[in-house]
């Protein structure tokens, strides 16, 4: 929804006053900034006419170089030249070191396990490096547009988790820039095409950038963009094509034990070769060694296709899974939008066309389409298009829930629910006199907490000391437009509440998401059985707890024989509950309930006698 224009009494809002806002595609390989000017949306070039800014930052003793200048020095100073920093956002140092890819950087570890780059200017984290990439883009926009920006929309991969999204917002905050919204990259592409082409129906967004792959299935209907399902791989992109080419060239030239400088030189040449093979059947690769030796080799398109075929096949497999999640077939997909520079690779376009059965859309530059969509959205959010009824409905990738007794998961917000969203559910106390309740927020599709991902823990204190089950605690999950989660617990009678904003310290890759989804399907039958067992065990514990309290208070209402029978059945329930037969536990509980019905009736009669003792009929 656009912001309203408000004027002082007696004055009118100035309809001609244009607020300055831009869209930024903070990419793994390149970044762009775009704006709406005179009704036209376009990316903004720098003084040299270059639209894209290489997402590269080099730290020297005296300065910070960003973009093309940093790229020029990357081969000579790889240790202090940070490329593809987006891949480090929200990830732990342990995760990075455990990965297959090696990096030329010297790392240190922060207190919470996140990576720090050791540079001539000290230790910097991925958020600070990202801020350095944003800095020239913001400066370029303000110089071109002629004023201070009132807000920006920054795009992120659809599979970025809360920590990665928050890191992106923090990078902008370091520069004092207001983030109007974080927008999923596929959704931004849909805006760019949807508004221009007035598309309605199901559309696939195939986004293959430098470091990430996202596939999103969207339904476009009268200005509403609803993401039906998302999938992809946050560790697969054009960078991986480059590394395969580099490995091929090293093998042909029989290069081993290469230093970081030569490795960077090879990587740069690999990218050039990849781009050349977009239009040519073959091209010559060339590097010069430190001793002046010149190495050359011919690389053909057929060879390159063979190298990357498995990776391209992985993206198609993700497309197939995501279509299944969305509940649609390829026949229902009206168009496929290509996003990201890596979609220029001929094999990628050929495979996408073969899978979806129609040529993909490429009328908007795939490198610029995301920035253009973000700019359109920024223009709306800042209030320049109050007539716009554009609505964005993104989805969350994994279900969110609360741990309940027995280690069970109570899902509050289901997977693929559109956001922003707010869902509430009521819980109660387990024991008499309970005055506090611990909450464990989890993420995942499995039935037991042990098989899900822990997000956060917090405690609600000040619950009135009532009987078990008498207190009512309302737990509300809110996921905002940026995908950030807030959980609030409130005791209804007193209004006492506690809340937490979930910002996981570690990132969650889409590979892990895919694994969690596969496991939920693979173990579905076992999980249901384990859940049924846990539920019966919890119910047995609740019944025994309640009955122990009742016997302690009113046990004198029973004679010795009656008490003995109840004690024996209670012992049997406890014994059976320790086993793994849910049906046997349920049967034992029912038998105990039947045996104690007369005791419950006596307790009720006794309570009534005590309540009315000493009162006259008139008082009653």
Swiss-Prot record:
Pfam family, one: HSP70
Family: Belongs to the heat shock protein 70 family.
Keyword ATP-binding in record: yes
Recorded GO MF terms: ATP binding; ATP hydrolysis activity; ATP-dependent protein folding chaperone; unfolded protein binding
Cystine bridges: none
Keyword match Cell cycle: no
Role summary: Chaperone involved in the maturation of iron-sulfur cluster-containing proteins. Has a low intrinsic ATPase activity which is markedly stimulated by HscB.
Organism: Shewanella baltica (strain OS195)
GO BP, one annotated term: iron-sulfur cluster assembly
Alphabetical UniProt keywords: ATP-binding, Chaperone, Nucleotide-binding
Gene that specifies this protein: hscA
Domain of life, per lineage: Bacteria
Protein name per Swiss-Prot or TrEMBL: Chaperone protein HscA homolog
């Amino acid at each position: 929804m656009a912001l309203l224009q408000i004027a002082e009494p007696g004055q009118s809002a100035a309809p001609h006053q244009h607020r300055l806002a831009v869209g930024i595609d903070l990419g793994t390989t390149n970044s762009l900034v775009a704006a709406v000017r005179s009704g036209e949306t376009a990316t903004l070039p720098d003084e040299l006419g270059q639209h894209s800014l290489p997402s590269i930052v080099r730290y020297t003793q005296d300065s910070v170089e960003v973009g093309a200048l940093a790229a020029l020095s990357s081969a000579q100073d790889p240790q202090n030249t940070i490329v593809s920093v987006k891949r480090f956002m929200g990830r732990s140092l342990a995760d990075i070191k455990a990965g297959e890819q090696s990096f030329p950087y010297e790392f240190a570890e922060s207190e919470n396990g996140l990576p720090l780059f050791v540079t001539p200017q000290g230790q910097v984290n991925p958020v600070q490096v990202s801020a350095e990439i944003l800095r020239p883009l913001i400066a370029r926009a303000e110089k071109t547009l002629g004023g201070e920006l009132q807000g920006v929309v920054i795009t992120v991969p659809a599979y970025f988790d809360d920590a990665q999204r928050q890191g992106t917002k923090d990078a902008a905050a370091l520069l004092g820039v207001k983030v109007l919204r974080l927008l999923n990259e596929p959704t931004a592409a849909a805006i760019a095409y949807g508004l221009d082409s007035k598309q309605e129906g199901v559309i696939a967004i195939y986004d293959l950038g430098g470091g990430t792959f996202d596939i999103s299935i969207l339904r476009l209907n009268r200005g509403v963009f609803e993401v039906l399902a998302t999938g992809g791989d946050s560790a697969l992109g054009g960078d991986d094509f480059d590394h395969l080419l580099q490995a091929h060239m090293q093998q042909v030239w029989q290069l081993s034990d290469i230093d970081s400088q030569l490795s960077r030189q090879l990587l740069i040449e690999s990218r050039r070769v990849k781009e050349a093979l977009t239009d040519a059947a073959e091209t010559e690769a060339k590097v010069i060694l430190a001793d002046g030796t010149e190495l050359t080799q011919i690389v053909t398109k057929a060879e390159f296709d063979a190298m990357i075929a498995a990776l391209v096949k992985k993206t198609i497999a993700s497309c197939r899974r995501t279509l299944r999640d969305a509940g649609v077939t390829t026949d229902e997909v009206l168009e496929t939008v290509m996003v990201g520079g890596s979609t220029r690779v001929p094999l990628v376009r050929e495979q996408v066309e073969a899978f979806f059965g129609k040529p993909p859309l490429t009328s908007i530059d795939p490198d610029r389409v995301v920035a253009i969509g973000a700019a359109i959205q920024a223009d709306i959010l800042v209030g320049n298009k109050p007539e716009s009824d554009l609505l964005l409905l993104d989805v969350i990738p994994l279900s969110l829930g609360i741990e309940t007794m027995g280690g069970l998961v109570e899902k509050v917000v289901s997977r693929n629910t559109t956001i922003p969203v707010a869902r509430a559910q009521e819980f109660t106390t387990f024991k008499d006199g309970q005055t506090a309740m611990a909450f464990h927020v989890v993420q995942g599709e499995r039935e037991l907490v042990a098989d899900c991902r822990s997000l956060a823990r917090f405690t609600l204190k000040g619950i009135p000391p009532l009987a078990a089950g008498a207190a009512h605690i309302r737990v509300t999950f809110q996921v905002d437009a940026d995908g950030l989660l807030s959980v609030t617990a409130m005791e209804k009678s007193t209004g006492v509440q506690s809340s937490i904003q979930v910002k996981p310290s570690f990132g969650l890759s889409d590979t892990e998401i895919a694994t969690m989804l596969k496991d939920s399907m693979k173990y579905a039958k076992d999980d249901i059985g384990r859940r049924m067992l846990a539920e019966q065990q919890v119910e047995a514990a609740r019944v025994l707890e309640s009955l122990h309290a009742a016997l302690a208070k009113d046990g004198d209402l029973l004679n010795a024989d009656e008490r003995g029978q109840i004690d024996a059945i209670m012992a049997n329930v406890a014994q059976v509950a320790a086993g793994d037969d849910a049906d046997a536990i349920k049967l034992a509980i029912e038998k105990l309930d039947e045996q104690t019905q007369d005791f419950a009736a006596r307790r009720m009669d006794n309570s009534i006698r005590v309540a009315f003792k000493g009162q006259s009929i008139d008082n009653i």
